[in-house]
Amino acid sequence: MSEVQQVRSEQVVGTVTPWAKRRDPSFDFLKGFLVVVMVVHHTLEYFVGPDYWLIRYVDFVTGGFVFAAGFLPALLLQSNPGGNRQKTCARLFARGVKLLLLFVILNILLGFLLEKSPGGKQFGVSQFFRNLYPIFLYGDKSLVAFAILVPIAYTLIALAILLQARHVRSVVAITALGLVTFCTLSSGWSFNLYYLSMGLAGGAAGMLVNPRLMGSSVRPGIKALLWAGAAVYMVSITFLRHDNAVLYAAGIFCVLGCAYTSVRAFEPETLWFQYHVVLGQYSLLGYLGQILFLQMLRRGHISALHWTLGLIPFLLTCVFLGGMSVGLDFLRKRNVTIDLAYRSVFA
């Protein structure tokens, strides 16, 4: 056993996440799918236009990241009822805090390096610290980059608290339903609150779904309902000027359910499958990397990048993300320092 493999083995034994020993490649595929769809979303936004009509059909991806952040730990926790729940919740809480710290560090670095993004967003260290209240309470996207990291972090922290409740399923479901309903009926919700509701909706779904009926075990009737729900969602956003939190959460659940159950049923050992799996294993880094890479291309002001609906920057970004993920995975398997450094930030 290599040095890195031994350290990883000790880390797995030292945690209460036995699912890490039997990592589901279909979950990684699902997260990789979200990264690729996010590349589509940002490519259209940066190189075609923020109001381009196709963007509405991939807009589920923003909430999808937060939904998955709540769904996966909740599902995996209930699939291991004999585990140490307090330690698992402590790990979720710590990961949420690390995401908040990562968000702060990234925005401070951008404040030092850039004055303005290609889209006109102002950056500055003093501006960031002057606006901590609206940034962390409301989620003002005009003031920061990587704003979605905050509701993802809040989702993990909230679940770390809620999952310790005695009647955990009821508590998570009622909390999620109340928050989604509030965001649907009220106009007073903020960016952070809206996407926190998506994260808790994912947590509720993860607690209510039977893990033994996932993937290839899902009945054909359930798969048909997921596809029908995804179709209804896509048709609805075609005719509605604005969707609502209930429709958005249901649409995310159906679209991600379709992606997961379809891949899980076949699990083809093909290059495209393995590509999405490795992207999913580094989904957070992939999310950050694709934004930075696309912004770099955007700052180049190369007219050819705007041709064919941004196909060229999309392909370049996909190649970059694949190379980054495979390269990092290669290095982590061979160098314990790199592996521990990655885990200290992203795991």
PLM regions: where:
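Alpha-helical transmembrane segments and their immediate juxtamembrane cytosolic regions
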Residues: 2-347
